Structure formats: structure tokens, C-alpha cells
Amino acid sequence: MRVLFAAAECAPMVKVGGMGDVVGSLPPALKALGHDVRLIMPGYGKLWSRLEIPAEPIWRGQTMGTEFAVFETRHPTNGLTIYLVGHPVFDPERIYGGEDEDWRFTFFASAAAEFAWNVWKPNVLHCHDWHTGMIPVWMHQDPEISTVYTIHNLKYQGPWRWKLDRMTWCPWYMQGDHTMAAALLYADGVNAVSPTYSREIRTSEYSEKLDGLLNYISGKLRGILNGIDLEAWNPATDRALPATFSADDLSGRARNKQVLQERMGLEVRPDAYLLGMVSRLVDQKGVDLLLQVADRLLAYTDTQIVVLGTGDRGLESGLWQMASRHPGRVSVFLTYDDDLSRLIYAGSDAFLMPSRFEPCGISQLLAMRYGCVPVVRKVGGLVDTVPPHDPAQQSGTGFCFDRFDPVDFFTALVRSWEAFRHQDSWRELQRRGMRQDYSWARSAMEYDQMYREVCGLKEPGPDAAAVEQFSQGQDADPSLAQGQHAAPTSPPEQSSEDLSKGPGSRNPLAKLFGGQRR
């Protein structure tokens, strides 16, 4: 099946939030299932120095009264084919923000739609967040292209209808209130990035005033949990670490902790309880909770805290003041550094995610992968990925609290600090987290099923010989006929012509004429 991703980010070249990780890591897992997956994204100015891009475009087009060019290149690590929409409006170094943000991404969405119609026509056009929200509206006219829309963060909803009226030809009744609403209405399939978040956004508390619409489309809404690239994030082979380690041998973490303390200007103490946080510094991430409890926690325990990230100026100022009150015990780096983030995951004892809401979260998965025990709030994808630690049952991978409240958060931190005093059980807790399977292979199977549903394709079944053998009782499981597990076969690629003529076609005339074109 031909699948075209349309997104504003792709890790590692352009990454602001979790969407970049998804767009950069999911396509290889889908390719392993037999899909031909490609990506179209804005041609930001910074990409020309980070990728090998030919001087000549593969296609020139026009939309919204403006000409653009499309350049073809490859992902630097996984070889994914990437199409870049080239136009001077994407030249600045910034990704988001600016007075022209709404126009820029509406223009990109329109260019992506034109490319899909005229150059590389996919069976499924997979759109990510509000930047591509108008694509399902335009593609609704084309019965040969199905659309899937992924909600990465419902809080960011795109330009409102009065702006869209001036930028697109779509009448007002096709747009909803904003691009997010338009995508939810017209996409053939919609998914959130975790099962719990897909349920939460149908309630008034987390819906950002879209609960009515989300309940209306609940029949096509599902939650598919994000994953991580286990090869790119592997503590046993990570070259950014001073010492590698694995679940079977955790000795290297002590060296990483020492280097982290030295680099961040903390007292070098192997017995100190070191808390790490790598995050955008915004209200969503619960940084204000940390500011409320940090002084008391530092007064009564031997805790150290390291924070890496950028964001809201008020929160940055609060963190700086906290660091100045506790020299040698609190360190704050207001930047983003990939190597330093890996060192924080590999050297910290616990990882903080006290989020107000969390669609899925990638950081807690990376933390567990590197043996860093997460302390999280029970919300969104954190519920699906961090089962609470139960010392009596020797189960769970982290510490959880319910209410977005400093008392609850402080209690969870004290519980984790007390557990850290018992090193034998703490190491078992670390190992359980490191052995969790949050690879993209599991998520890719669910996306594959979703693609088949929106295209009207049936699930692949066993061949006739296997069914006959099973019916005669020769083997209890046809896949074990030779005494071995048969490797799953990838689905055959379906052309657009096959889709229009197949029994599951979205074209109602196919049933009337028996799949024959008249």
C-alpha cells in the first residue's frame, strides 16, 4: 500500500515535540510490513545544510496563487524518501511562530494535496496535527485517496475559520471552527497517540472544547500508542554515553551519574538521589509543580535535580532562581542538547513527568529504556506506559500520582526517594523498565489495520491449503504445520485501480457494476 505522510516535523532533522519522533521512526516499521511509505514536509532553510538535496526540483506546482517547487531527498538514517516543499516562506530558521504561521502551514497543506493528486498518488494520506488539517477536507473529493489524521496534541488547533475563508476556496461549512475541527470531520480515520488520551479528549476536562465533536466522531476515533526506536536509543551501544550498560549489567550507570554530576556542576555523590527532567518548559509539563515542591524536597532529603529544556520565560526564571538557592544541588540548562539529554536519561536515578495532560509522551519511554525510573502523573499516555510500582508484588515500572496537586506530587517523590534507599529492589525496578517492549513494530501493526479499514480492504487470511489442512485436523494451528512459526507475510501492495474495483471499494458504483468500469 502506498502511504504518504504529511507533517511539519521529522526527527532528527526537525524536532520540536513528540510528532517529530513519530514521523521519523514509524515509517521504517510500516515499511517492514510491506508498505511504500514516503513523507512530504516543508523545506525549512536549515534542511539544506543537513540533507543532500539536488539543485533541481522534481516538480513545480501552484496553489493559493503562489508557485512552489518540490525537491526529493532521503532521511539521513533510515533512507525514507522525503519530499520538501520549497518556497521562500519556509527559509527562516524558525519552525513555528510568527504572524504568517497560519498562512505558511495552510499553504504547505495545499501544496501537499496538489503533489498527491499530480505526482505521487497514495492509497492513504496520513496527516499529522493541525498543520495538515485541511488536507482531509480537500481529499474528501477523491474516492481513490483515503485520509488518516493523527492528533498529537489537541491543544494546538490551528487557524480559525475567519482566517481560512481568506486563504482557501473551501466554503465555511467545510471548515469547522478551525483546521483541527475540519480534519476531525472529514478524515476517514482519526487516532490519538495513546488509548487513554483518546478517551480523555472526549471529556470536557481534556477536550479543549471539542468534546461534542469528538464524541460525534467516536466511531472512527481510536488510540494507538507511540513507540521508540530501540536501535537509536540503546544504552548498550550509545556512543554519547561515557559508559554503556544493559539490563543485565547496570554497572555503567554509576559512571554516567558521576559524569552528569560533574558536567552539571553538582556535588559528586554516588549516594545522592538524582532527579532528571528533559522537557519543553510549558504549563502542560507541570514545571510549576516542581517549583512548588522543590525547596521542601531538598530540605528534607539528599535529592539533586537537573533540568534541560527551553520554553516559557516565567518558568525559566523560576528554575534559575531555584538553582541559585541550591548551588551544587540544582542545575538548569536552558537549551536542548541531544547528547546531554541521553546523559540525563543514563545518569539520573529517576525522571520527572508531572504533566497536566500528556497525549502519549516519549520521554518516559526513553527514561525507562535507560534505567531511569519515571515519576509521573496518571494521565494520558503515562497511564498506558508506566504501571505503578508495587513492591509487594514486585511489579510496575514507576511511581504515579493522581491529582495535579503539589501534595500528591511531593508524596510520590518521597515514596520514590524511600524506594531508592533499598538498592536491590531499586535495581530490579530499573531492569523491569528497561525490558519493556515499546518498539514501533507493535504500533505499526495497529496503523496497518487502520489503513486497511479506511481503504475498505480485508485482513489477509491463510491460503486455501492451510485452511483445508486445519479443517481436516492435521494441525491445531496452520501456521505451525511444519513445526515452526511461519513468518508473517506482508500484505501485497494495492494499486489505486485495485482499490477502486475491489469488493471493499469506497466507490458505491463498484458494487452496482460488479467492479467493471463502464
From Swiss-Prot:
Instruction: Write out the entry's keywords from A to Z.
Output: Glycogen biosynthesis, Glycosyltransferase, Transferase
Q: Per UniProt, what is one GO molecular function of this protein?
A: alpha-1,4-glucan glucosyltransferase (ADP-glucose donor) activity
Residue ranges of the region described as Disordered: 469-518
Enzyme Commission number(s) from the entry: 2.4.1.21
Associated pathway: Glycan biosynthesis; glycogen biosynthesis
The residues that hold ADP-alpha-D-glucose are: 15
Which reaction is the catalytic activity of this chain?
[(1->4)-alpha-D-glucosyl](n) + ADP-alpha-D-glucose = [(1->4)-alpha-D-glucosyl](n+1) + ADP + H(+)
Q: List the disulfide bonds.
A: none
Q: Name one GO biological process term.
A: glycogen biosynthetic process
Q: By its UniProt entry, which PANTHER family does this protein fall under? A: ALPHA AMYLASE DOMAIN-CONTAINING PROTEIN (PTHR45825:SF11), GRANULE-BOUND STARCH SYNTHASE 1, CHLOROPLASTIC/AMYLOPLASTIC (PTHR45825)
Q: Which family does it belong to?
A: Belongs to the glycosyltransferase 1 family. Bacterial/plant glycogen synthase subfamily.
* HAMAP family per UniProt: Glycogen_synth (MF_00484)
Role description: Synthesizes alpha-1,4-glucan chains using ADP-glucose.
What protein name is recorded for this chain?
Answer: Glycogen synthase
Q: What taxonomic lineage is listed for the species of origin?
A: Bacteria, Bacillati, Cyanobacteriota, Cyanophyceae, Synechococcales
Gene encoding it?
glgA
